[in-house]
C-alpha cells in the first residue's frame, strides 16, 4: 500500500477571516505546530464561519483506491476556550460524509490535529474512483466557539491506494522469467 496527501488548491467559498492574502487554499496547506508562530491561517471569533475548498487531483498510478482520511489542524489559545469543526467531504453535487471534530479544547499555545474517520467508500458501498477523488471538495464550518479567536491552519485528505502490479518480462541468462 502507498499513500498520497491531497492539499487544497482552489477556493469555492469562504467567510472565515484570512490572516494574509486572498486565497483560502493557500492558507490551509502548511503545518505549523504553534498558534503564535503561524502567519498563514483562517480565523473566526464566532460560530458560523464556513469555507469550501477543492483539492489537488489524484494522479498516482494505482490498481485500487483503498480509503481516504480527512485531517484538520486548528486551535484557540484563549483560556478555557473550545471549538467544534464540522467537516463535509463531498463534491459539487453533494456531500458524501459529514463529521464533527468533537470539542477541541483550548491548548494555549499549540494547534490540535484532528484525524477523522477513514472512509473506504463514497456512500457505504461504492468504491472510491480516481474521477471521484479529482472532484473532491471539503467544507469546514466553525460549528461551536466559546470565546477568543479560533485559528484553522491545515486541511488535507490522505488517500491510501495499491500501486499497480509490475510485470517484468526480463530475460536473464537466456531464460524468460
Region spans (language model):
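Enriched but not universal
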Residues: 1-26, 156-177
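Short carbohydrate-recognition loop motifs
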Residues: 29-47
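Short beta-strands within extracellular/lumenal beta-sheet-rich domains
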Residues: 43-61
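A short beta-strand element within beta-rich, extracytoplasmic domains
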Residues: 62-77, 138, 157
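Short glycine/proline/serine/threonine-rich loop/turn segments at secondary-structure transition edges
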Residues: 64, 122-135
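Short, surface-exposed beta-strand/strand-loop-strand elements in extracellular ectodomains
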Residues: 80-93
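Extracellular carbohydrate recognition and processing domains
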Residues: 95-127
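Short beta-strand-plus-loop segments that form exposed binding edges in beta-rich domains
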Residues: 139-148
